[in-house]
Curated annotation (Swiss-Prot):
Entry membrane topology: Peripheral membrane protein
GO cellular component, one term: ATP-binding cassette (ABC) transporter complex
UniProt keywords, alphabetically: ATP-binding, Cell membrane, Membrane, Nucleotide-binding, Translocase, Transport
EC number: 7.6.2.11
One Pfam family linked to the record: TOBE_2
Catalytic activity: ATP + H2O + polyamine-[polyamine-binding protein]Side 1 = ADP + phosphate + polyamineSide 2 + [polyamine-binding protein]Side 1
Gene name per UniProt: potA
Protein name: Spermidine/putrescine import ATP-binding protein PotA
InterPro entries xrefs: AAA+_ATPase (IPR003593), ABC_SmlMolc_Importer (IPR050093), ABC_transporter-like_ATP-bd (IPR003439), ABC_transporter-like_CS (IPR017871), Mo/tungstate-bd_C_term_dom (IPR008995), P-loop_NTPase (IPR027417), PotA-like (IPR005893), PotA_ATP-bd (IPR017879)
Role description: Part of the ABC transporter complex PotABCD involved in spermidine/putrescine import. Responsible for energy coupling to the transport system.
Provenance organism: Oceanobacillus iheyensis (strain DSM 14371 / CIP 107618 / JCM 11309 / KCTC 3954 / HTE831)
A single MF term (Gene Ontology): ATP binding
Length: 370
């Protein structure tokens, strides 16, 4: 059961190598017990550095790393109740499955009967009972990953760190392992911190996501919150497909873009404030020019299996991406429709704290109006 107690806290943590630019720039966040967290971002954003700082593989240049209320900056990795599953799994090729999983327990000098019991339990969690004597070289990529996870959980750590463990798997197996990892975390109740650059993985598995770019957390929240209410252009563009355009917030609940004014659900900004608007492609409905809110010309069309991916151009040269089960014809004029709640207004340079306060005020307004 999730108890909402903090287990890890970063307080203004920075990391710099030599005289290079900051890899992490005054990062602060809280990790709660029993949840599945994902650190999401492009290469070089700082996500793996955060993982290494938590594990104790590197030290912070400044700031405090807190574990269960105690500062652990200088506590070595082997003294932390944290285990890591690496991208290449880091299994011992000369040891079989049992010996790999039992390795950490043997270092602790536990009795053989206890080691046998714990290894069997760990292998049962990852559906590998009966594989104890299998050589690592004879196992598939998915099986090797399960061995690595069993080796991590057998020590009963408080936190498991996963450094892009699915990246080497083929697409079908990657999807399967997403389900298995999520189910395993929920059964164990252990805090998982997962690193990836794949936004689909993050959305599918996480209780909460931290989106990073250039050493800073851009936004944190549930998958739904981040997808539905991105804080800025980077997050909107990185999490899923997006239509992003410059706009003007005329007044509360009224925004102007593509040469027209549209009703929206956003408020609390300055009159005529320059903003950006994001509309997800799946929220754009194809209709006739007469019924459309925006008139566009179909530019390209690709069949993606579950939908058509259609790019369109409006009279001002803005490109609109539409995902629809309706087929369009390249060169034809069509109309696009969307609802006020499909329009998400983003302020320039808004802090996450201010952003959260603004969204909270929307909920308070709904409550007051009831």
């Amino acid at each position: 059961m999730k108890n909402n107690q903090p287990i890890i806290q970063f307080k203004n943590v920075s990391k710099q190598f030599d005289n290079d630019p900051l890899v992490l720039d005054h990062v602060s966040f809280t990790i709660e017990k029993g949840k599945f967290y994902t650190l999401l971002g492009p290469s070089g954003c700082g996500k793996t550095t955060i993982l290494r700082l938590i594990a104790g593989f590197t030290e912070a240049s400044s700031g405090d790393i807190i574990f269960e209320g105690k500062r652990i900056n200088h506590i070595p990795a082997n003294k932390r109740p944290i285990n890591t599953v690496f991208q290449d799994y880091a299994l011992f090729p000369h040891l079989n499955v049992y010996e790999n999983v039992a390795f950490g327990l043997r270092i602790k000098k536990l009795k053989k009967s206890m080691i046998d019991e714990k290894v069997k339990e760990a292998l049962s969690f990852v559906n590998l009972v009966g594989y104890e004597n299998r050589e690592i070289k004879d196992m598939s990529g998915g099986q090797r990953q399960r061995v690595a996870i069993a080796r991590a959980i057998v020590n009963e750590p408080a936190v498991i760190l996963l450094d892009e463990p699915l990246s080497a798997l083929d697409l079908k197996l990657r999807y399967q392992m997403q389900y298995e990892l999520r189910e395993l975390q929920q059964r164990l109740g252990i805090t998982f911190i997962f690193v990836t650059h794949d936004q689909e993985e993050a959305l599918a598995m996480s209780d909460e996501i931290f989106v990073l770019n250039k050493g800073k957390i851009q936004q944190s929240g549930t998958p739904n919150d981040i997808y539905d209410e991105p804080i800025n252009r980077f997050v909107a563009d990185f999490i899923g497909e997006s239509n992003i355009t410059k706009a003007t917030m005329i007044e509360d609940y009224l925004v102007e873009f593509a040469g027209k004014q549209f009703t929206c659900v956003d408020m609390g900004m300055n009159a005529n404030e320059p903003v950006e608007v994001v509309i997800r492609p799946e929220d754009m409905e194809i209709t006739s020019v007469e019924q459309g809110m925006i008139s566009v010309t179909v530019h390209t069309q690709l069949f993606r299996g579950v939908h058509y991916e259609i790019t369109c151009l409006d009279s001002e040269g803005n490109e609109w991406l539409v995902q629809s089960t309706k087929k369009a014809i390249v060169g034809e004029q069509i109309g696009l429709r969307f609802h006020p709640e499909d329009i998400h207004v983003m302020r320039f340079n808004e802090s996450e704290a201010d952003f959260d306060r603004r969204l909270d005020s929307y909920s308070e307004g709904e409550t007051d109006g009831e």
